[in-house]
Amino acid sequence: VISKSCLVPELQSIADNFWHYSEKVYSRPEVKQHCLWLQNQHQRNVNLLLWLSFCQQQHWTVNLELLLIQIRSSEQKLSDFRKHRQAMKPHLSERQYQLLLKHELKLERRQQQLLVLSQQRHPGGQTAELALNTYIEQPEEAAQYLSTLKAALQ
């Protein structure tokens, strides 16, 4: 797990920019809905979807295979925690539930830092748009996702 202090300033700046980008686009209901649909119906990682779209905005190339390998462990932890949080919801006060959500956001941010670190170590040669299409696996879904993001950024 990467803590904030482990990232050199340049990488921390990229991680912070990515986090703010994610907050901005994910706060749009249509983007959130589409991301969650891809997560729930097609087991796609929301952070990776957002990262690939962020990389596309930056005109960066990526190595999708290595990105997937890098986040595999953190994705399992996040998924397990998310299931636990959802199962516990009926048994918790609103304050307790909000604490679990806050912890989940910390896990999400750490996963984003892993993506940034992996990108800097292994930038790859695949355009981010091609990687996004490959990752989503369905051209029409990828096009719709990109269209939704584009509208959210305007």
Question: What is the predicted function of each stretch?
Answer:
Residues 90-154:
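A charged, amphipathic interaction segment
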Residues 30-68:
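N-terminal interaction modules that seed assembly of large macromolecular complexes
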Residues 6-16, 32, 41:
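N-terminal leader/targeting segments
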Residues 2-6, 63-119:
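Aromatic-anchored, charged helix-turn/loop surface patch used as a conserved interaction hotspot
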Residues 1-13, 151-154:
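Short, low-complexity, intrinsically disordered N-terminal peptides in bacterial proteins
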Residues 36-37, 61-76, 126-130, 151:
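Short alpha-helical "patches" and their helix-cap loops
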Residues 2, 16-29:
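Acidic, glycine/proline-rich low-complexity segments that act as flexible tails and inter-domain linkers
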Residues 15-18, 44-48, 93, 97, ...:
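Short runs of predominantly hydrophobic/aromatic residues within well-ordered alpha helices
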